[in-house]
Amino acid sequence: MSMFCFQCQETAKGTGCTIKGVCGKTADVANLQDLLLYVMKGIAINSLQARELGIVRQDVDKFVMEGLFATITNANFDNARFVALVREGLALRDSLKADIVKAGGVLPANLHDSAIWTADSAEEFEQKAAQVGILATENEDVRSLRELLIYGLKGMAAYAEHAFALGYEDNSIFAFMMKGLAATTDDSLSADQLVALVLEAGKYGVDVMALLDKANTTSYGNPEITKVNIGVRNNPAILISGHDLRDLEDLLKQTEGTGVDVYTHGEMLPAHYYPAFKKYAHFVGNYGNAWWKQDKEFDSFNGAILLTTNCLVPPKDSYKDRLFTTSVVGYEGVKHIPAREAGKVKDFSAVIELAKTLPAPTEIETGEIVGGFAHNQVFAVADKVVEAVKSGAVKRFFVMAGCDGRMKSRDYYTEFAKALPQDTIILTAGCAKYKYNKLALGDIGGIPRVLDAGQCNDSYSLAVIALKLKEVFGLDDVNQLPISYNIAWYEQKAVIVLLALLYLGVKNIHLGPTLPGFLSPNVAKVLVENFGIAGITTVEDDVNLFMGA
């Protein structure tokens, strides 16, 4: 076994990748990610002690946030970047220890190895990485709970990073990241204590999504009902993918008046719903579908491509020289745009200059799709929605948020959407929408049957909408609403969304296309018995189950 990773839905055989990641990451990169996590656990241990002494280092918090984000599925495949991050982490950890001593603190004599181990060479890193991976925790249930917590923290870090880019942060979220990471080194914690920490992660998941919602809406306005073009124009263009709206804003400013159009891809589609971006005439529309189709769609786009966050798949040679990464994203041999300097826009001139020399996109479809149904927009038409429920025109809502992916079994979600009765409405967020957002599913009294709230973090909007409906209908429990949850997951942001929903009291969530490989039988049993978590079966049986047939 040259590596072990089971953090994503597509993990080999549903149990773990051991030679190379299904995502495309090499064993070297997987092991360095394990080592980076180990170093960050040591940083977290020291950070907790520093915080008790009133020492809060933003550089340390930012490093851990970005380090967690860099290890998310399909974010960074660059060996050299992880070697550099491990070195940076060790230096930050040791400077934090020096601050503790300077402030009169006494470092514990029995510090965990992650807080004291040090090395500098790539060879030493490789040796240590082999000792500190996931399987270093021998107890299957403890391992499962620790990894569930870590994957929740990774998703939390991603959302915190997006908010941070817009100038929004919350010290309590950073403090919990440290608490959670440090807890995964504590062998004295019982399974019940780890379960409690996992649920506490759900609380901070709600907090971080609320923070990001505030950051996005304060910066760019509240999403509104919007028709998005899916065709192309005959101009050179840049395709922007990922989730980072600040990067999009910088790119739109710099491309204005250059003759270069900008299109979104994948999870960047919901940017079109924000009022602030509608003033850009060269912001043309959305090109293509979910992340996993990029190997074909990046080819036919012809222009320059910018990856602001995950999801990146190992690029084909046919477009690799047109591809740029930024932020935590990386791939060996792909050009990387450095971080923005304080008070300045990020410099995308290299992307723009290349785009000018390239042909216009090849058209792959035409028409429009509709979205923008985040909480503020839905509240604006709340009377209509409530009346539709009271009159019986709408019998049930289906939350089908989450992720898309490569597996053929995900066609289930397309067929499920088609099979739902005409008196039902789908609430969605995340790239799971691409399984049904181009189907002609119609409307109910002018309300579209697919209401897209936005990116995966906008699952927060769906939770806010559910809580508002609970209030409007005078119910005691959110589970009394005519809402069913049939969620597709893929990576770690879906994990924090799930934990957030559990924290809010939502029960009977169906998760697919398979249950996470990192859930041990006993941990899965806890989730089933306490929260009603279930998998999916067939479209017909599941529709009948949800509709109470």
UniProtKB/Swiss-Prot annotation:
Residues binding [4Fe-4S] cluster, per UniProt: C5, C8, C17, C23
InterPro entries: HCP/CODH, Hydroxylam_reduct, Prismane-like_a/b-sand, Prismane-like_sf, Prismane_a-bundle
One GO CC term, this protein: cytoplasm
Gene Ontology MF terms in the entry: 4 iron, 4 sulfur cluster binding; hydroxylamine reductase activity; metal ion binding; peroxidase activity
Modified residue annotations for Cysteine persulfide: C403
Coiled coil, from the record: none
Binding sites annotated in the UniProt record for hybrid [4Fe-2O-2S] cluster: H243, E267, C311, C403, C431, C456, E491, K493
Required cofactor(s): [4Fe-4S] cluster; hybrid [4Fe-2O-2S] cluster
UniProt GO BP: response to hydrogen peroxide
Catalytic activity: A + NH4(+) + H2O = hydroxylamine + AH2 + H(+)
The record's free-text note on cofactor binding: Binds 1 [4Fe-4S] cluster. Binds 1 hybrid [4Fe-2O-2S] cluster.
Cellular location(s): Cytoplasm
Main location: cytoplasm
Broadest EC class assigned to this enzyme: oxidoreductase
Annotated keywords: 4Fe-4S, Cytoplasm, Iron, Iron-sulfur, Metal-binding, Oxidoreductase
Entry EC no(s): 1.7.99.1
Entry-linked Pfam families: Prismane
UniProt-listed SUPFAM superfamilies: Prismane protein-like (SSF56821)
Function: Catalyzes the reduction of hydroxylamine to form NH(3) and H(2)O.
HAMAP family found in the cross-reference section: Hydroxylam_reduct
Family to which the UniProt record says this protein belongs: Belongs to the HCP family.
Official protein name in the record: Hydroxylamine reductase
Source organism per UniProt: Desulfitobacterium hafniense (strain Y51)
Lineage, highest ranks first: Bacteria, Bacillati, Bacillota, Clostridia, Eubacteriales
Gene: hcp
